[in-house]
Amino acid sequence: MSGALKRKRSDEVAWSRRRPVKKPVRRAPPPRAGPSVRRGLPSLQIQTLVAAGDTMITVPSGGICSLIGTYARGSGEGERHTNETLTYKVALDYHFVATAAACKYSSIGIGVCWLVYDAQPTGTAPTVQDIFPHPATLSAFPYTWKVGREVCHRFVVKRRWCFTMETNGRIGSDTPPSNVAWPPCKKDIYFHKFCTGLGVKTEWKNVTDGKDGAIKKGGFYIVIAPGNVEFTCHGQCRLYFKSVGNQ
């Protein structure tokens, strides 16, 4: 009887009155940015620049500099709808073919391709010498060029690639003798590059064209230099961009 009426200790009473601790409920992580999440976001616009036939590009010694962010004002897929554009990606698919004059000699040339951002455009297209000042004795060695010290605040190299071309002293119309096989060489090559994360912002003047004079800030150029093997360029340059800012 005395055992049944035994009083509980005070610490046992306090322990029995404690509320059970609830474990925190784990919430599922937010869904990743898949197709269902991205469905509401506007897709990137695409502009394609074609170099073929009459628009074929000839790359002489010393190189060329050409505007690729050429977004005219309009409502089309490859046109800007506002006064600002953001270029995110660039895909280059070019076929380089050594000229007949270059094929007459046996040589190896290392060419370079740059994507250059112009922070302070002047209304006219910059030349290769404006961006990469160099003496005439280095015209055949573009891999040694650097952005000029006086214009380094204006021109920013976003991407840079080197490529190699070769000639063996024979042009395409030459026919080898029946008992001789000419080894192949890289007198024509496929040049493919796809770059992302560019983030090139361009502000446009209140005009409708997309040329150099229409750019207020942020020109986007491609520079190609052939080394000592001049060539022609055929193919496409595709730009992925968005129209942002005010109408």
UniProtKB/Swiss-Prot annotation:
Keywords: Capsid protein, DNA-binding, Host nucleus, T=1 icosahedral capsid protein, Viral penetration into host nucleus, Virion, Virus entry into host cell. Belongs to the geminiviridae capsid protein family. InterPro entries: Gemcoat_MSV (IPR000143), GV_A/BR1_coat (IPR000263), Viral_coat (IPR029053). GO terms for cellular component: host cell; host cell nucleus; T=1 icosahedral viral capsid. Disulfide bonds: none annotated. One of its GO terms (molecular function) is structural molecule activity. Encapsidates the viral genome into characteristic twinned ('geminate') particles. Binds the genomic viral ssDNA and shuttles it into and out of the cell nucleus. Plays a role in protection of the genome from degradation, virus acquisition and transmission by insect vectors, infectivity, and systemic movement. The CP of monopartite geminiviruses is absolutely essential for virus movement. It is found in: Virion; Host nucleus. Residues 16-26 have a biased composition (Basic residues). Residues 1-39 are annotated as: Disordered. One of its GO terms (biological process) is symbiont entry into host cell. Its main location: virion. The keyword Cytoplasm does not apply. This is Capsid protein. A motif (Bipartite nuclear localization signal) lies at residues 1-28. Homomultimer. Interacts with the movement protein. Binds to single-stranded and double-stranded viral DNA.
